[in-house]
Amino acid sequence: MKFSKFFLIILFISSFFSSAQSSQEKVLNNLFNQLKKVNNSKSAVLLETKIWSIWNEHPTNNKLTERLEFGTELMQYGDYNYALRVFDNIIVTDPKWSEAWNKRATVYFLMSQFTNSLNNIDKVLSLEPRHFGALSGQARIFIKLQKYEKAIKSIEKALKFYPLFKSGELIPEIERLIKEDSI
């Protein structure tokens, strides 16, 4: 009897978490569909803001959302080592939350640890392939590493999901750098 009650409780909890995540995914799918079709930058930025809001909110655990906010504040104030520990802890708690990986990738970028940042970006993109922020960060690292063709590919991937993405404006500049390198 105790085992079956325990099993039912576990089943209920897991269905709740699954439902919250699928609900969040449905909203994201809708926003990304709108983002592909929008034809003015003001509307695009509003949709982008909504997407970021969802990415920054854990689907089932408000404490993780609060920790992500705290880590982000630490990062903004330049306390990269402490922010890194906060994001590490979040990732251990929920390794499937793409935004925790993205924040850690950002900290590594700010610390000029580009290989670590790229590894974290790869994880972000495995969890959320449409993450235009991670793709933009990846492009910026490739620019710093003078891997210009890879930078363009990263931006082009982001533009598939977000055609009016500001990072698209980097492509002509990157192409100029490629020409300069070939001289």
Question: Which residues does each predicted region cover?
Answer:
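TPR-adjacent "capping" and linker segments in tetratricopeptide-repeat scaffold/adaptor proteins
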Residues: 21-23, 52-66
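Canonical tetratricopeptide repeat
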Residues: 103, 137, 170-171
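Register position in tetratricopeptide repeats
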Residues: 57, 76, 110, 144-145, ...
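TPR alpha-solenoid repeat register
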Residues: 100, 134, 167-168
